[in-house]
Amino acid sequence: MEAESQRSQLAARIRTWAHGNDNVRALVQTGSLARRDGLVDAFSDLDMDIIAQDPVGMAKNDDWIHRFGEVITILHLDAVDAQSWPTRLVIYAGGIKVDFTLAGLARLQKMASPAGLDPLYERGYQLLVDKDAFAKALPAATYRFPVHAMPDEQRFLARVEEFWFEAFHVPRYLARDELLLAKQRDGTMKELLLEMIEWHAIARHPEPVDIWHLGKGIRHWAGEAIWAELQATYGHFDASDARRAYQATTALYARLAREVARIQGWPYPESVERALR
């Protein structure tokens, strides 16, 4: 309860500051604290969109970040192609993390148009500060999750072959006692395994599946059986256990990929697996 109280106090300080800052026109809370999926806990972050007249100016100076509490560290992520606005990921004393997005008025103006809410806001949002009456124009959140699409056959086959390409190297590295290199390859294999688990969940369910990024909530959306098998795919930093984990990883991937191919009516590259496994 102490962590939740500290988080609430920090949120209140951010809100008070936003009210008194002329540059800030709106403050929007997103994330688990704005959704209705019951996933809020003591470790939940604060996700705040600061809608400002001059977000670029705010991004150039961190002084405002220090107004809300004792700052431990700040991760600066500037706007790039896949990210329209700069973000500042801040950890405050007490272990409270706040993800600030510094956006211009266009962020809300676009969603107030026929384009509608983006997937983040569609899951749930709360207007904590609204100086320009955006609430009148923004659609209400539906609290629905975005629907993930299956890849096409070409991409599926390419990714399966990429997995077996990576798998080809691991036994060789282990034979050379290059454990770190083996683990690095295994890391790429795990990324491809997660992708296949996602595709498997989509393929076997007729209804949309709420798949989160980076495997969050995987035990829920992938199922207990896959969760149990997945645990065996992680090994210790020794050759013997790494080999065991490698066998578990390749076995799980092969099974899931074959099931996806069968459900979708796609071919499976058996010859590639036989040659590289």
Q: What residues fall within each predicted segment?
A:
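Flexible, active-site-adjacent loop/turn segments at secondary-structure boundaries
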Residues: 41, 125-127, 216
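Conserved nucleotidyltransferase catalytic core and NTase-mimicking acidic/glycine-rich helix/loop elements
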Residues: 146-277
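Conserved NTP/Mg2+-binding pocket subregion across the NTase superfamily
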Residues: 3, 67-176, 181
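Short amphipathic alpha-helical segments, especially helix-boundary/capping motifs
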Residues: 10-13, 63, 141-147, 230-231
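Metal-dependent nucleotidyltransferase catalytic core
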Residues: 1-22, 30-42, 49-111
